[in-house]
From Swiss-Prot:
GO molecular function: protein phosphatase regulator activity
Keyword terms of this UniProt record: Brassinosteroid signaling pathway, Cytoplasm, Mitochondrion, Plant defense, Stress response
Organism in which the protein naturally occurs: Arabidopsis thaliana (Mouse-ear cress)
InterPro entries registered for this protein in UniProt: ARM-like, ARM-type_fold, PP2A_B56
Biological processes, Gene Ontology terms: brassinosteroid mediated signaling pathway; defense response; negative regulation of brassinosteroid mediated signaling pathway; negative regulation of innate immune response; response to photooxidative stress
Main location: cytoplasm
Annotated signal sequence range: none
Disruption outcome: No visible phenotype under normal growth conditions.
Name of the protein this chain belongs to: Serine/threonine protein phosphatase 2A 59 kDa regulatory subunit B' zeta isoform
Key word Coiled coil present: no
Function: The B regulatory subunit may modulate substrate selectivity and catalytic activity, and may also direct the localization of the catalytic enzyme to a particular subcellular compartment. The holoenzyme composed of PP2AA1, PP2A4 and B'ZETA acts as negative regulator of plant innate immunity by controlling BAK1 phosphorylation state and activation in surface-localized immune receptor complexes. Required for the formation of the PP2A holoenzyme that negatively regulates brassinosteroid signaling by dephosphorylating and inactivating BRI1 in the cytoplasm.
Subunit-level organization: PP2A consists of a common heteromeric enzyme, composed of a catalytic subunit (subunits C), a constant regulatory subunit (subunit A), and a variety of regulatory subunits such as subunits B (the R2/B/PR55/B55, R3/B''/PR72/PR130/PR59 and R5/B'/B56 families).
Gene Ontology CC terms, in alphabetical order: cytosol; mitochondrion; protein phosphatase type 2A complex
Highest classification ranks of the organism: Eukaryota, Viridiplantae, Streptophyta, Embryophyta, Tracheophyta
């Protein structure tokens, strides 16, 4: 009976081993601890069918089947698949007669027949249904879902090593159900904005009742001790990993969470793929920064990298330092950086904690991409700056303290009270206050004018109170230098007042000159905007003499 159901098994593939250099830098085990329990598989809900924007891309899933199935598809050309256009057949129906029916349960067959039944169920699940119409193929969809759930239990509890055929069929089934192209967005007219994201609901994957279970199967397979990495790398190869990375652009956060966990497991299990994974993530970042500024999975990719960076061996390789300089630091530039800033900040701080000499590079990078008109983004930059400074030693701080102090002074004088407050809070950090104290002769003259202007005229009372406290701290550090800075500030204020008065007198002369010329000639007079006071005086005397 079993032989009649299954028919012929696929041929054993030829071995094509791929050579790759061993990756360095392990994976932080704390990530596995927090993700050791897999996500529970929920029942199909009506919400999964609300968004059908991705359904069109899923219709092409059948084309992802390996070449071994091409002859089968060619024989069916011109014939309508079961259930009309709602079904994409990536392989032959596993049961005779072209009817999509459930195969026997694993509990109902002998142990010797379970491997064959496993292959049959995998082949059966290569049929992809269209979820854009939730009323079609309800019976077949439920049969496939129950079959997928059986495969989850089988993969999790299998008591022997997976062989070539099992790995080939499993990865083929995963590819058919998961790998797809997302609709391209109009990047020119729709740049990802955090404000827009608050108003718009993300598009959910319509086929999630099936897709979720397929992700669960892949996760159990990669994490299983019965999966031999040396054998599995022939099927979970560079192409497979790259297609997994492409799926991170999914709008469905549930899918990105599964991908994050699976890719982390792949990075930990397949050491041969580690350099390639890092390079592929780099390329995603480069394209995001330089071309699109639109990608849904940057935060998840950075979260994976945070754990990878934590496992880097010391001393850091030049490759890793270039990654920091060319990919991570420029990620502060896009307008939508607030979406992933928390994960980005964690990666940046990890690098500084690994190698304190990178602090100067990181701080100068932050100053390079410091926001000018986005106050909320500026507050986030100040928070990240504080975390970086906590890991910064005195020697590195001295290399960048002058431009850094100038930027902090600009933040202190910001009319946005949250920016000014966040800059003043830096003095509450003991380590940062010690760095300022050690270098107060350089820093105090730079920030003192900003503090004094806040004390005298900032519109926000809370900012004024915090400024007075910081002013007292500086006074306690060096009373003599404080008095010198105060005297210099007062002189500069007097000079500014005189310059302002002189400028007003200059404009008054211009107005008087224009008025007198108009009265005499009854014609408009064009006077250069920037005219020296000497020329103005000469012109006035000549006009008076005439």
């Amino acid at each position: 009976m079993i032989k009649q159901i299954f028919g012929k098994l696929p041929r054993k593939p030829s071995k094509s081993l791929q050579n790759d250099s061993n990756g360095e830098g392990g994976v932080n085990n704390s990530y596995y601890a927090s993700n050791s329990s897999t996500t529970s598989i929920s029942k199909p809900s009506s919400t999964s069918s609300k968004s059908s924007s991705a359904s069109g891309s899923r219709v092409a899933n059948g084309t992802l089947a390996p070449n071994s199935m091409s002859s089968n598809r060619n024989t069916n050309q011109g014939k309508k698949p079961l259930g009309g256009d709602a079904v994409v057949q990536a392989g032959p129906f596993p049961s005779s007669g072209g009817v999509y029916e459930a195969l026997p349960s694993f509990r109902d067959v002998p142990i010797s027949e379970k491997p064959n039944l496993f292959i049959g169920k995998l082949s059966m699940c290569c049929v992809v249904f269209d979820f854009s119409d939730p009323s079609k193929n309800l019976k077949e969809k439920e049969i496939k879902r129950q079959t997928l759930l059986e495969l989850v239990d089988y993969v999790a509890s299998v008591g022997f090593k997976f062989n070539d055929v099992s790995m080939q069929e499993l990865t083929k089934m995963v590819a058919v159900n998961l790998f797809r192209t997302f609709p391209s967005a109009n990047h020119e007219s729709k740049i990802l904005e955090i404000h827009d994201m608050d108003d718009e609901e993300p598009s959910l994957e319509p086929a999630w009742p099936h897709v979720q279970v397929v992700y669960e199967i892949l996760l159990r397979f990669v994490a299983s001790p019965m999966t031999d990495a040396k054998l599995a790398k022939r099927y979970i190869d560079h192409s497979f990993v790259l297609k997994l990375l492409d799926l991170f652009d999914s709008e469905d956060q549930r899918e990105r969470e599964y991908l994050k966990t699976i890719l982390h497991r792949v990075y930990g299990k397949f050491m041969v793929h580690r350099p390639y994974i890092r390079k592929a993530i780099n390329n995603i970042f480069y394209r995001f920064i330089s071309e699109t500024e639109k990608h849904n999975g940057i935060a998840e990719l950075l979260e994976i990298l945070g754990s990878i960076i934590n496992g880097f061996a010391l001393p850091l390789k030049e490759e890793h330092k270039l990654f920091l300089l060319r990919a991570l630091i420029p990620l502060h530039k896009p307008k939508c950086s607030s979406v992933y800033h928390q994960q980005l900040s964690y990666c940046i701080v990890q690098f500084v904690e690994k190698d304190f000499k990178l602090a100067d590079t990181v701080i100068r990078g932050l100053l390079k991409y410091w926001p000018v008109t986005n106050s909320s983004k500026e507050v986030m930059f100040l928070g990240e700056l504080e975390e970086v400074l906590e890991a910064t030693q005195a020697a590195e701080f001295q290399r960048c303290m002058v431009p850094l102090s100038r930027q902090i002074a600009r933040c202190l004088n910001s009319s946005h009270f949250q920016v000014a407050e966040r800059a003043l809070f830096l003095w509450n950090n003991d380590h940062i206050r010690n760095l300022i104290t050690q270098n107060h002769k350089v820093i105090m003259p730079i920030v003192f004018p900003a503090l004094e202007r806040n004390t005298r005229g900032h519109w926000n009372q809370a900012v004024q109170s915090l400024t007075i406290n910081v002013r007292k701290v500086l006074c306690e550090i060096d009373q003599v230098l404080f008095d010198e800075c105060l005297a210099k500030f007062q002189v500069e204020e007097v000079n500014k007042t005189e310059v302002k008065a002189k400028r007003e007198r200059t404009w008054q002369r211009l107005e008087d000159l224009a008025t007198s010329k108009t009265v005499v000639t009854n014609e408009a007079v064009l006077v250069p905007r920037f005219v020296s006071s000497v020329n103005l005086t000469t012109s006035s005397s000549e006009s008076t003499g005439s």
